[in-house]
Design a protein with these regions (language model features):
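Rossmann-like dinucleotide-binding core of oxidoreductases
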Residues: 137-252
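Nucleotide donor/acceptor-binding cores
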Residues: 2-3, 128
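Conserved N-terminal/central alpha/beta ligand/cofactor-binding core
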Residues: 3, 8-103, 107, 157-158
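Active-site-proximal beta-strand/loop segments in catalytic clefts of secreted hydrolases
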Residues: 7-10, 133-134, 213-214
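Glycine-rich, N-terminal phosphate-binding loop of Rossmann-like dinucleotide-binding domains
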Residues: 118, 134, 143
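Core beta-strand elements of the Rossmann-like FAD/NAD(P) dinucleotide-binding domain
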Residues: 120-129, 133
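A conserved hydrophobic secondary-structure block that centers on an alpha-helix together
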Residues: 97-123
Length: 252
């Protein structure tokens, strides 16, 4: 009988979708937001809806422009954590949390086994098929696969730290016009409190607001640089949230 083993370094599944509180599936509808979704994403959407974790597919307009419409699904990340555990359990998947892959054994160009590490020490697991869904493609790289990072100049998309705010008067905030949002954003940039030229804060079913407004240049392959970035990102979030409280209607 075929068995599936899922290895995860964290205490939860879902990667950045859950652990980083991304809170929005974006651009998966292939330009047809009204078409019923199938497969795994349908299971996820149905489960989130049943648990009150999503309002379903919505359309957002980047920078308030009607020609930049994108279908998205806002969701509650904690509800998604529970849902993914349930789906994995129902599918009969064996799970190893708090476990990291530290190497791959390759024969004739095929991965035959993985070296893993957890509190039980270093172990080896083998399988016929290995699917690398790691953040950096670490399994594929350790197996000798080619890799690239950044554009032709090595420039990467900046890092960001998602955060949430509660107690917001969402109705008042949603009345703020796009020109006013851009004016406030420019004010925040000039004061050294904001880092993007728009107010990127949207509501979730729970009534909280999630935001993606910090921006940090970082090489994610440099652990020391990444560590400093984690601290700076939190400083940025404090500046951003304070600016919202002092300047944006609904956040007082």
């Amino acid at each position: 009988m075929t068995k599936t083993l899922l290895i995860e370094e964290k205490a939860y599944l879902g990667g950045t979708a859950t652990g980083a509180q991304v809170s929005m599936f974006m651009g998966f509808a292939d330009g047809e937001p009204d078409r019923p979704q199938q497969g795994i994403i349908k299971d996820v959407m149905d489960g989130l809806a049943a648990a009150g974790g999503t309002p379903g597919i919505e359309t957002i307009y980047l920078c308030g422009r009607r020609d930049l419409d994108i279908p998205v699904i806002p969701y509650e990340s904690e509800i998604l954590k529970d849902l993914i555990f349930d789906l994995v359990d129902q599918a009969g998947v064996e799970l190893l949390l708090h476990t990291r892959v530290i190497g791959a054994q390759v024969e004739d160009g095929v991965i035959t086994a993985l070296t893993i590490h957890n509190e039980q020490g270093v172990q080896t697991v083998s399988g016929k098929v290995v699917i690398d869904a790691s953040f950096h493609g670490s399994v594929a790289v350790s197996a000798g696969c080619r890799w690239e990072i950044g554009d032709e100049k090595g420039v990467l998309q900046p890092g960001t730290l998602m955060y949430k705010m509660a107690g917001v008067d969402i109705a008042r905030y949603e009345q703020v016009s796009q020109p006013e949002r851009e004016r406030l954003a420019q004010k925040g940039i000039e004061e050294g409190c904001l880092y993007v030229n728009n107010l990127l804060a949207r509501p979730l079913p729970s009534g909280t607001i999630y935001s993606n407004m910090s921006r940090i240049r970082i090489d994610p392959l440099d652990a020391a640089q990444w560590s400093r970035a984690e601290m700076e990102a939190r400083r940025q979030v404090r500046r951003i949230s304070r600016f919202f409280i002092e300047n944006v209607p609904g956040f007082e």
